[in-house]
Amino acid sequence: MSMKGKETMSNEKIVVGKFGATYGIRGWLKVFSYTDNAESIFDYSPWFINQKGTWVEYKVESWKRHNKGMVAKLEGLDIREDAHLLTNFEIAIDPAVLPELSEDEFYWRELFGMQVVTTKGYDLGVVSDILETGSNDVLVVKANLKDAFGQKERLIPFLEEQVIIKVDREAQRIEVDWDPGF
């Protein structure tokens, strides 16, 4: 696979979308966005594609809505054959391009690995995943090996003030009002 983008060294990236099939003969690709507002994917630049274990940088030359989706033209990809090589590759961005948040806000990715503790001090485990259920998100908490309640995993609804009492980014800790037996 030829790499027309620029290689980068930083390995921490955030996947924000995926390329679909080529569109036309001039190097355009269909884009499937994972961002809340689909068009927001184009607010982030540059994009990175993991090609054979190396993050390769690409810049969007142009994009447009097409039918119910979106298509993009990347700099340096001028023919269908070159663009076809990126079909089904995930689109990632550098975390540094994300907007800075206020002290009481956070990105979901920051919650992974945080310790989850009840208001009474019981250590429930660490956040291993977050499920989007539609009504509210749910923390998947991997329990400690010697959990007194025999739990391996807990599903805790992310309901601020009702269940989630405090998220402390600095201490890497989430305080919850939750029964450890659940």
Swiss-Prot record:
Pfam families associated with the record: PRC (PF05239), RimM (PF01782)
Keywords carried by this UniProt record: Chaperone, Cytoplasm, Ribosome biogenesis, rRNA processing
Any one GO MF annotation of this record: ribosome binding
Compartment list: Cytoplasm
Residues in PRC barrel domain copies: 103-182
Recorded superkingdom: Bacteria
InterPro entries: PRC-brl_dom, PRC_barrel-like_sf, RimM, RimM_N, RimM_N_sf, Transl_B-barrel_sf
Domain-related comment: The PRC barrel domain binds ribosomal protein uS19.
Subunit structure: Binds ribosomal protein uS19.
Function: An accessory protein needed during the final step in the assembly of 30S ribosomal subunit, possibly for assembly of the head region. Essential for efficient processing of 16S rRNA. May be needed both before and after RbfA during the maturation of 16S rRNA. It has affinity for free ribosomal 30S subunits but not for 70S ribosomes.
Family: Belongs to the RimM family.
Annotated PANTHER family: RIBOSOME MATURATION FACTOR RIMM
Record-given protein name: Ribosome maturation factor RimM
Gene that encodes the chain: rimM
